[in-house]
């Protein structure tokens, strides 16, 4: 039974922690499951990620970001996500098209319809069955990152991160049925309990 689940949110909201926890939980239940992430998730995609996050040699415009993120996405979908879904597996992806719309559209100010069009082209119209949005105050979330050196996006000003958060809110408002919105400031155990509950319901519906 194939299922496509994505995790979304700003920097430091706990997406990686919760996506890994869900992956381990589903594997223990004996379900075929694949855990991946954006940007990257493939050898070629990881090279693009390093350019996007850490390059300081050349200016990378918002449009270039949009195109590079979607080039990485297209590779990931063709080589990881689609094959796994075709095999009837559950795919968990840390970030997907909503992040691009929130960051490059709302955050960077690119035309939203253009971002949606490029996203759709690169993804082949593949839409998640469930998107888990971990929402948190951007300042508090960035404090979670600790003393690790910030990448190009983490080092952006508070205004940028607030626009990104508002962007996720706008996306959620247009497709609330696809989303599970959670307060990322809650204890990790409580967040995961709510995720398990929603995924269990979704799995039950798919098995009927």
UniProtKB/Swiss-Prot annotation:
The gene is tmk. Belongs to the thymidylate kinase family. One of its GO terms (biological process) is dUDP biosynthetic process. Phosphorylation of dTMP to form dTDP in both de novo and salvage pathways of dTTP synthesis. CDD domains: TMPK. GO terms for molecular function: ATP binding; dTMP kinase activity. Keywords: ATP-binding, Kinase, Nucleotide biosynthesis, Nucleotide-binding, Transferase. This is Thymidylate kinase. It comes from Dehalococcoides mccartyi (strain ATCC BAA-2100 / JCM 16839 / KCTC 5957 / BAV1). GO terms for cellular component: cytosol. Its EC number is 2.7.4.9. HAMAP family: Thymidylate_kinase. PANTHER family: THYMIDYLATE KINASE, UMP-CMP KINASE 2, MITOCHONDRIAL. Gene3D superfamilies: P-loop containing nucleotide triphosphate hydrolases. It is an enzyme of class 2 (transferase). InterPro entries: P-loop_NTPase (IPR027417), Thymidylate_kin-like_dom (IPR039430), Thymidylate_kin_CS (IPR018095), Thymidylate_kinase (IPR018094).
């Amino acid at each position: 039974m194939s299922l496509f689940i994505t995790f979304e949110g700003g920097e430091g909201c706990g997406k990686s922690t919760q996506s890994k926890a869900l992956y381990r939980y589903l594997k223990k239940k004996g379900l075929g499951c694949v855990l991946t992430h954006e940007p990257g998730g493939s050898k070629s995609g990881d090279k693009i990620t390093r350019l996007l996050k850490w390059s300081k040699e050349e200016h990378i415009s918002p449009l270039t970001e949009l195109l590079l993120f979607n080039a990485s996405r297209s590779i990931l979908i063709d080589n990881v996500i689609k094959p796994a879904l075709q095999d009837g597996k559950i795919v968990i992806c840390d970030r997907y098209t909503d992040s691009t719309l929130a960051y490059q559209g709302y955050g960077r100010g690119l035309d939203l319809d253009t971002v949606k069009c490029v996203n759709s082209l690169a993804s082949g119209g593949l839409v998640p069955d469930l998107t888990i949005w971990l929402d948190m105050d951007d300042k508090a979330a960035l404090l979670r990152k600790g003393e690790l050196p910030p990448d190009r996006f983490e080092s952006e000003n508070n205004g940028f991160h607030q626009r990104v958060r508002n962007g996720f809110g706008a996306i959620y408002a247009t497709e609330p049925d696809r989303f599970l919105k959670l307060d990322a400031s809650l204890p990790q155990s409580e967040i995961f309990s709510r995720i398990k509950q929603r995924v269990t319901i979704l799995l039950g519906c798919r098995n009927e």
